[in-house]
Amino acid sequence: MGILNSISTPADLKALNDEDLDALAKEIRTFLVDKVAATGGHLGPNLGVVELTIGLHRVFDSPQDPIIFDTSHQSYVHKILTGRAKDFDSLRQKDGLSGYTCRAESEHDWTESSHASAALSYADGLSKAKQLDGDTTHSVVAVVGDGALTGGMCWEALNNIAAGKDRKVVVVVNDNGRSYSPTIGGFAENLAGLRMQPFYDRFMEKGKTSLKSMGWVGERTFEALHAFKEGVKSTVIPTEMFPELGMKYVGPVDGHNQKAVDNALKYAHDYDGPIIVHMVTEKGRGYAPAEQDLDELMHSTGVIDPLTGAPKSASKPGWTSVFSDELVKIGAQNENVVAITAAMAGPTGLSKFEANFPNRFFDVGIAEQHAVTSAAGLALGGKHPVVAIYSTFLNRAFDQLLMDVGMLNQPVTLVLDRSGVTGSDGASHNGVWDMALTSIVPGVQVAAPRDEDSLRELLNEAISIDDGPTVVRFPKGDLPTPIVAIDTLEDGVDVLAYEDATEDDAPSVLIVAVGERATVALEVASRITQHGVNVTVVDPRWIVPIPQSLVALSDDHDLVITIEDGVIHGGVGSLLSDALNASEVDTPRRQIAVPQKYLDHASRSEVFADYGLDADGIETTVVGWLDSLFGE
């Protein structure tokens, strides 16, 4: 790591010669494999942007020239080159480096949300601010790729960027061959129009030999132009779209040829106006296990053996795999069930449904808003759509859920993976807002399974509902030990435990456990009986609307405690409190929930412990309440 060790700021890159730059790129790839193998993280995307990121920091003057990485999971090389290489052993660990750009870490990091398709809007606003300040010298650079251009927000931003003819905005499209689906949206239509033009055949015939002589970039470009009609993924962007927007276009550029990268970026740096630079890169570049992973190119990994790329520990069946299996069973029985993903078929468990029912599966790209309204259209046509997305990405589609699905009472089922605390991916990946958001949609019904069996049951129940939207939410991670109910009330509420104290006149506590929080609720219940209280633990299963039996049970107890993994305002505790007020039930109630703040990255167990949401923390809190309410 001789050259890498000499790099502490971007300025150190500017004096390197060609030989040094090639060596540095190799050192960075070795460094990435070694470090990410030990912590887990986004390996493939970062291996693909080594030369590109070196070029960005050689040509532009960060942070005076802001460099914004869309999604920012591909910002590891940027972190390395801006003085943070020494901290990579702590990547995605508590109190360590974030897996995304982070304003608290460095002045070179301008943003930190890991939601896609936002970088161009940030760049548009930053460039306007510079213009208002009279700064006509510095550029604003936005690096966008990995499918982000399938998000509508990018095109809204491009429309505005293009209108600023004298604003120096550099849009770097990192095209790694995995980003664009020709069967979706205007890309395919645009090239189809190009193909119909008289010059197209002449161009392709004359260009075939010269393109293929350009090496892998030329071959991929030629093949991609023909691939659209066949529905194959392509690396080429319909380049005539950008001049029509009023933007200069440069490319395609070999994103692994440092000299070519630098030259293209220098041209963009000197250009007085908005410009697109199209870089063709290879995700997973230089690491054989990633290059051989044809499905994902090691987009994201856990802890792995750096030599083989194999996981250090075997993964256990999780919530997503149970959902995946059950949805296929349901799909086999009901041909009206269809599935929708926003560019995440594998991570959300829909790949198996796609394999079994390809005509009933729809990948809409990174477009959650469109996904939900398209689902409403499918429902209007007599289908029952299941939209599987990460909970955090529901935030973008809330208006569509509220107005396009909810107001029309359409039977759309949203399956929210990674609900609650997600941990190491940090603040913007936590799914702690979904209960507060969905609960305000009139007519929506929300379910929170506690284990594998209840997930299967609730998914079937949700899809059987045909008079309005349903939501099934479950967390990240391994499945808990199954919990068998000892009783089920009329409206489906499961009673999980009755824990009696030794005293005959002991106060009674009702614990309402939401979803997989049932496991910790049972542990807490067994502990607090030692403090002289009787405890009943229930799992509502359907948490929105509040089951009426919870109101009756609350009236029969001396204290009601809700335990959930969403934010404290607007969650089940708030909803139950409202229901008790409406029924004039004055039983004291308390909430155990996620605080109303953005959570730092750490493991799920560390986050729960930090905020008093593990068994020890909850016990301490509850005992304090008991002493306050019932102590002598």
UniProtKB/Swiss-Prot annotation:
Quaternary structure, from the entry: Homodimer.
Protein's recorded name: 1-deoxy-D-xylulose-5-phosphate synthase
Residue ranges that the Swiss-Prot or TrEMBL entry lists as coiled coil: none
UniProt catalytic activity: D-glyceraldehyde 3-phosphate + pyruvate + H(+) = 1-deoxy-D-xylulose 5-phosphate + CO2
MF terms in GO: 1-deoxy-D-xylulose-5-phosphate synthase activity; magnesium ion binding; thiamine pyrophosphate binding
Binding site for Mg(2+): D146, N176
Residues bound to thiamine diphosphate: H73, S114, H115, A116, G147, A148, N176, Y287, E368
Taxonomic path: Bacteria, Bacillati, Actinomycetota, Actinomycetes, Mycobacteriales
Cofactor(s) annotated in UniProt: Mg(2+); thiamine diphosphate
Free-text cofactor note: Binds 1 Mg(2+) ion per subunit. Binds 1 thiamine pyrophosphate per subunit.
Record-stated family: Belongs to the transketolase family. DXPS subfamily.
Pathway membership: Metabolic intermediate biosynthesis; 1-deoxy-D-xylulose 5-phosphate biosynthesis; 1-deoxy-D-xylulose 5-phosphate from D-glyceraldehyde 3-phosphate and pyruvate: step 1/1
